[in-house]
Each structure stands twice: as structure tokens, then as C-alpha cells.
Amino acid sequence: MSKRDYYEVLGVARGASDEELKKAYRRCAMKHHPDRNPGDAAAEAAFKECKEAYEVLSDGNKRRAYDAHGHAAFEHGMGGGGGPGGPDMGDIFGDIFGNIFGGGAAGPRAARRGADVGYVLELDLEEAVAGIERRIEIPTLIECAPCHGSGSEDGKVETCGTCHGRGQVRIQRGIFAMQQSCPHCDGRGTLIQNPCKTCHGAGRVEEDKVLSIKVPAGVDTGDRIRLAGEGEAGPAGTPPGDLYVEVRVREHAIFQRDGDDLHCEVPIRISQAALGDTVRVATLGGEAEIRIPAETQTGKLFRLRGKGVRSVRSRSEGDLYCRVVVETPVNLTADQRELLQQFEATFTGEDARKHSPKSATFIDGVKGFWDRMTS
């Protein structure tokens, strides 16, 4: 049977970058990995195919040879450096699967740990600031109870006679010697003659796990909480992976967060801005007062020390910044409109410049601009 194009195997364009190749290989390998598809011959073949494709395309010399000659580049010694499967893949697997399966390709698969699991936890701002204990439910692989994770119905596990329990075999390709996973035991180092009827020899079963998570006060979007040993159960009774809970804080109707500081807008009336007043504002700890001085303009910031968020790391407290917005009155009555018209009539001549200096400066600027344009 003819081999598929390596770029097609990984699902990338021929001009794909090294990073795109690596991501594509990660997706392909994770999808077809034998640990996730126990007993599935088609998945195992697909896994080996994407492994071979990545080995060639991730090597600059081999990729150039493949682009020029296709699969023929690795027949009869062409291409140099051995054909696909030549070099030890330990470094690649250590990089890509190191954090997922607990190590590189060296040694029996039994030395690997379970996969880490990710979970996104959404919180309201108040919950993130105060801290909370939350119960979550996650689908994951847990140790098979009937066989205690061994994968064997009777608990008996035999040492592989091909690799003698090492999970690796040494092969020679021309002048190159390499280690690869034992094809007889699939790198486990052991064989199961009587597979467990519950897990079919995998040693693990899918189940929804319920956990209680204590979220510390002050967390923010992007913070991660690690729960050691709460990830997927390891294959063949090996240690489990970890659970990483990523926090996402929902947008708040009043406050915007910037680190440990909070920001909000405080609308005030024209009369309050002109004459001054004391207004009450909301904080996460209750109400507080702000004294608005006379002649306050839109955009003025008022700082309330210690009314922000207590830092999850240093335990110091942030501040609350209140930005004043002078609100234009709407739905005026006839009397209110008349009073405002009378008030506006007082802004004439130099009085207008004195009471509205920014407006006067703006008008002068516009007049000067047109004078220069028409002169």
C-alpha cells in the first residue's frame, strides 16, 4: 500500500512553519495515542504514521529531501541520516508529551504518569475577590476498580519476553542503532493474557469526577490552581496526572478590574458639579462617600485607598478609582427648561469666557484656524 503524503498526514500546508508542524503533530498524536485508544489497531497505525511524518518534516535536511523526492528520498539510502524512524524520538516525545504523560519515550511506558487535565472555572467578580469553595464535575479517566488499574481480570501481569520488561527494543538500521517501543507489548514492558472485562485491559475507565475546589481570595482571570494527583489515572497503575483549574472572571456591571485596583464611573448632575456635593458610591465592601468640590469637571478621578482587591500574592490591598461623569439632564419640565434658558442668558461677553474657559479657548482656536485658512 502506498504511503500518504506526510503533509496530508499532519493536515498542514507544504510551507508550514516548525511551530505549525509541532502543533499539528501534537493534535494527531494525542488523538491516536495508544493510551487513549487501547486495543484499537487503526488508531495505533495512525499514531505511527503521524510520528513518522513529524520525524521527517521536523528535520530540515530530511524535509528538503522529502520535498524534492517524496518518499523515494528514503529508499536505498537516499537523503542521509537514515530514513523515517532512524533517530531516537526521545527528545521529541519528551518535549511534546513530557507534561502530559510524565516523561519522554525512554523506558517502559509503565514509567509514565497520567495526563494532566484542564478545567475553566468562571467566577463573578465578588466571588473572585472574596474567595469561594466551588464543587466541579469533570469527565476524566480514573483507575478501574475491579482490576485496581492492572488491566488484568485475574490480576496477573506477565513480563514481555521480547523486551524483557524494558518496554524498549534495540534495532539496527545500517550504521545507526536506535531504541524504539517494543512492538510486542506496545512499550509497556508487560503483557496481559486475561484482560479485565470492565476496562478491556486499559486499567482505566471514563467517569465524571466531582471535586471541591477552594479558590483563594483575590484571584483574577488567567490565574491557575493546581490540584496534584487529580488528573487522569496513570496507565497500568502509574501515578495520576494533575488538574489545572484556570480562572475566568466575568465582566461586572459597575467595576472594571486592573490588577488589584478597581475602576468605576460616578454620574453627577450639573448642579452637583458646579456647586459641589457629597455623593455615595458603591464599593465591594459596602458604600463610601466622595466629596465633590465645586467646579468639578467630567473625567476627574477620586481615589479611595484600600477599596480595591486584596492581592492573592502579597495580601496588600488595591484602590478604587472613581471617575466623575457630569450627566446632561433629560426629560426636562417646562419650568426646568425656562430656568436653564435664564441661566444660559447670563453667559455673555467676558462673563462667558470667565465661566467657561475651555469653551472660550476652543472657540478662539477655531476662529484662528479659519483666519489662517482664509488669509
From Swiss-Prot:
GO terms for cellular component: cytoplasm. A zinc finger (CR-type) spans 131-208. SMART domains: DnaJ. GO terms for biological process: chaperone cofactor-dependent protein refolding; DNA replication; protein refolding; response to heat. One of its GO terms (molecular function) is ATP binding. Gene3D superfamilies: DnaJ domain, Heat shock protein DnaJ, cysteine-rich domain, Urease metallochaperone UreE, N-terminal domain. Its main location: cytoplasm. Keywords: Chaperone, Cytoplasm, DNA replication, Metal-binding, Repeat, Stress response, Zinc, Zinc-finger. Binds 2 Zn(2+) ions per monomer. The keyword Metal-binding applies. Its cofactor is Zn(2+). NCBIfam families: DnaJ_bact, PRK10767.1. Participates actively in the response to hyperosmotic and heat shock by preventing the aggregation of stress-denatured proteins and by disaggregating proteins, also in an autonomous, DnaK-independent fashion. Unfolded proteins bind initially to DnaJ; upon interaction with the DnaJ-bound protein, DnaK hydrolyzes its bound ATP, resulting in the formation of a stable complex. GrpE releases ADP from DnaK; ATP binding to DnaK triggers the release of the substrate protein, thus completing the reaction cycle. This is Chaperone protein DnaJ. It comes from Xanthomonas axonopodis pv. citri (strain 306).
